[in-house]
Amino acid sequence: MAAADAEQAVLAKQETKQDCCMKTELLREDTPMAADEGSTEKQEGETPMAADGETNGSCEKSGDPSHLNAPKHTQENTRASPQEGTNRVSRVAENGVSERDTEVGKQNHVTADDFMQTSVIGSNGYFLNKPALQGQPLRTPNILTSSLPGHAAKTLPGGASKCRTLSALPQTPTTAPTVPGEGSADTEDRKPTASGTDVRVHRARKTMPKSILGLHAASKDHREVQDHKEPKEDINRNISECGRQQLLPTFPALHQSLPQNQCYMATTKSQTACLPFVLAAAVSRKKKRRMGTYSLVPKKKTKVLKQRTVIEMFKSITHSTVGAKGEKALDDSALHVNGESLEMDSEDEDSDELEDDEDHGAEQAAAFPTEDSRTSKESMSETDRAAKMDGDSEEEQESPDTGEDEDGGDESDLSSESSIKKKFLKRRGKTDSPWIKPARKRRRRSRKKPSSMLGSEACKSSPGSMEQAALGDSAGYMEVSLDSLDLRVRGILSSQTENEGLASGPDVLGTDGLQEVPLCSCRMETPKSREISTLANNQCMATESVDHELGRCTNSVVKYELMRPSNKAPLLVLCEDHRGRMVKHQCCPGCGYFCTAGNFMECQPESSISHRFHKDCASRVNNASYCPHCGEEASKAKEVTIAKADTTSTVTLAPGQEKSLAAEGRADTTTGSIAGAPEDERSQSTAPQAPECFDPAGPAGLVRPTSGLSQGPGKETLESALIALDSEKPKKLRFHPKQLYFSARQGELQKVLLMLVDGIDPNFKMEHQSKRSPLHAAAEAGHVDICHMLVQAGANIDTCSEDQRTPLMEAAENNHLDAVKYLIKAGAQVDPKDAEGSTCLHLAAKKGHYDVVQYLLSNGQMDVNCQDDGGWTPMIWATEYKHVELVKLLLSKGSDINIRDNEENICLHWAAFSGCVDIAEILLAAKCDLHAVNIHGDSPLHIAARENRYDCVVLFLSRDSDVTLKNKEGETPLQCASLSSQVWSALQMSKALRDSAPDKPVAVEKTVSRDIARGYERIPIPCVNAVDSELCPTNYKYVSQNCVTSPMNIDRNITHLQYCVCVDDCSSSTCMCGQLSMRCWYDKDGRLLPEFNMAEPPLIFECNHACSCWRNCRNRVVQNGLRARLQLYRTQDMGWGVRSLQDIPLGTFVCEYVGELISDSEADVREEDSYLFDLDNKDGEVYCIDARFYGNVSRFINHHCEPNLVPVRVFMSHQDLRFPRIAFFSTRLIQAGEQLGFDYGERFWDVKGKLFSCRCGSSKCRHSSAALAQRQASAAQEPQENGLPDTSSAAAADPL
């Protein structure tokens, strides 16, 4: 199949070039080329013009009138050559290299030998007049360089052998079409046409530095590289095919892969952030009571939440207590009524009636099952029981007898008579949920009907009715149902008092004594339940008991049929491992935990069968213990110790949830209750379905951290509220959804719980509270327990208010560290922004909450330099509000103090505004720019004087702040101060001292431009001059990206790009872009790895817009633009230079060499060659970047013989190997204030070395005047020694 795919890929490449196999071909063609950077490049060119009086090739005159007045050359008025037409027909390979015919010459460039052309417009805007009968060159050469035989250019590192030799360069301007693959066209094909023609001028070009090792690599035959291509083809093809397969995963339906509340969150996160007003309009069309409501059941209509969900979910956070709670006699249905998986269908009629009730401003209270024997026997009288049975029987008889199955497979819980009755009523065609009874429906029932007595008392008086009620559920099991057995046993084991009553009534139990002992249902299987399967979040719900510690299984689920060890335990979705262990009776029916490791009882009715259970979970009937699996006497069982199992796949529960296991015998039925209070508490605290079924906010596989609820009064209050719900029947209250918001804000835990039980939507938003949710209110007040309750009940943890505030923002702004920790651990996003662009870090920094800021930064997901809509960073907010310790913290975390806001103020401006001299000193010690001016021309001294901040004024004056600097209004700091104030006096004195010493002229650094990039860079680049009166250079156009003035035919076809399909940060070895670069060369901070070869830098292929990774992946650095603080300044002897305003670590991206993309032939006719950078193409046409007329700050970077920058070829938006982007990375630690420099290359100095010398000042300078003189002396001495070989011997023989 792989061979067939490869053959099909090759065929598709030959025919259509648009098949997905183009990715495979591109990998096969590009990878060897990326590794072949050291191969020999054929370069050609002509002798260039010299620099205009500046040194190191980066300095020119302030203006160039000839260029400024020249007409611009546009693409529209360019006439294509015949070769260009051929090139359009030729095929372009996926790697960007043209696969044109070998006879095709250079395209899109003016040939120098065409004397029939009388007038041509060059790409630089000049008219190129060429008389047909004259042999003049296209440009009049400068007198200084007319006789220079070299062609200088800045070059890339790793190819010293690629520079053109002076002896091979032609002396005529005539050229012939270049034949690719046949060597240098200029050196072989150019032939003189007349002996009297002028000598062509070769242009100076900056190049990549060449190493000695590069000479050997460059000298290798190209065929050797091609030999290595073959074994890589199959590997690359497989990699590409795998990448394509990863692009087409089979995703399940959204409602099947996530609970509906998760789907709600997943969609509303992005929608809320992008279209807040559209969402608000859409939501407002609903009734106010229905705003934001959603169900926990996928693909269901909106409905109120059910009572059983809230009780069930809080079983994971309540903990058992020892003492009086054990005295309560609670029936086992306390767990099963709320733990079963009842699917309440919301019919249209039901939804309409509920909406009508909501429009009147009230929610229906949840009707607690009256027949539920959770009510303690001590507090419930027989009269109350009779009344309850009458009411429930009335409801049963009123429902029509249809007997149809409605999702019967999902309703097969046999835990209690109450659940059977409810499902029986539902299957009878009852449209209303029996859990929530609208008041008007209850009012319709004006007369009572005979009751079938389906309750705990019905077990004693009417066994026939029990069997009838059980028939509806028995169909859900695949084996013979034990419904009637369970019901009889329930009647036997309901309570201690009932046991005594049952002993006196043998007529009920005497029919079948064997059914008195409950048997397990380990081998019974219940059909799938859509609700439980969805809320299980595709994870196993098993809880393991390992040495008295409980752990959660995190394995994925394959089969969704439900299982449980007994009717006391909830229905579970299990993984294959736990399904097999369930069938082997390794799950204790008493507590529902898997007996994994520790001390257990083991019953062996047969040699090949063993039943595991806890000693205290044995079934007890009439003071006799029995095996809860088979009913055999427990005395026959033996205690075994199972070795500790591998628990690496489990999640250990909170310490508070484990203490219930220390006394696992609390299920002892001799106390009169099959689910006594301790057993109920233990089940609630460790029930596996609670955290599984209520995980609405986190991604798949995220377990809600129940340990986030701290031990304290909130925990005790919650426990008491849950116990009250389980032991008593609360009054039928009618709550308005608005009450949930106020109760959450006031910390009324019990009321919040009751309202959630009643089904009030936890995402209800208050219209008059900026559409804030109860979670906003709880987070704002710091009620962690209520936050946990709301999140577990389905509250959207990232819900946004009208001003786009999230609950995490409210907690951070109000300094509730515990709430912040809980929300982040529960999955809240830390980087959303509110309507003003502020994150939670901005809000906390503004208020000075040190601990919150420290925790947010330690989380690792927060950007310490994030800016809001005003451009203000957390550092600026902390500075303005005088939070000194917070400023120190942010500075230690890497905060950039020179980031400018929208008005180009830096932190020092805001320190002057606030008047905090301590922060100002900290900022100045961190090398903050004291002379920075904002958009109004104000320096920090201006602002301090205007705000009358005397201490700051004195501090700035002591640091030599310019008191004479004028802003755009023409005001000096002295004029900004209040007349005769203390600040005015200090400024006046400073000015007088300066004026009193006119004989000591001090060079004052003046800011001649606040940003030479005019805002095109993310970080402004100021220009200063402290040497002379030269203004900021204006004889060029600043551009932040490469530009063209003539067609270059760069292959930007997105289908030709090789791309990755990474889901991580692209740091793994499987990233396709990293493989093209041999590996990802960036670390997590965006710096080059230490093993990066600075001498011969490899090609770097960054991730592009065709990749599936995120925009902030690790393999995107250069495309993020300028990040370092740079400054253009006037040097003493090298014209303009560039220096850093901050410390730049090793391997940091500094800037990119940006200019005009031109061809090699076009570079030969350019008059100014000081800004040419050779792109070092290996095959075919050679291209250059000319920063003379268009460029960025890198055009001012001077040469240095010990460079602190190295140029690297990088590919981003395209992968055309002819046009790499040149990125400068630091080769060592660059100190703040240090001048930047890179090695121009030998080719540049071969031409320019005769015009000027290098003045880098390095001890290893190779191109200084002294080094040049030494080389000339050595060169002159060698011929002399060769001409007189016997001079030394003759002198020795001379007696004189």
From Swiss-Prot:
Residues 1-111, 170-200, 341-470, 653-714, 1271-1296 are annotated as: Disordered. Zn(2+) 1 binds at C1060, C1062, C1066, C1071. Residues 1124-1241 form the SET domain. Residues 342-360, 392-414 have a biased composition (Acidic residues). It holds the Pfam family Ank_2. One of its GO terms (molecular function) is zinc ion binding. Residues 438-450 have a biased composition (Basic residues). SUPFAM superfamilies: Ankyrin repeat, SET domain. Belongs to the class V-like SAM-binding methyltransferase superfamily. This is Histone-lysine N-methyltransferase EHMT1. It comes from Mus musculus (Mouse). The lineage of its organism: Eukaryota, Metazoa, Chordata, Craniata, Vertebrata.
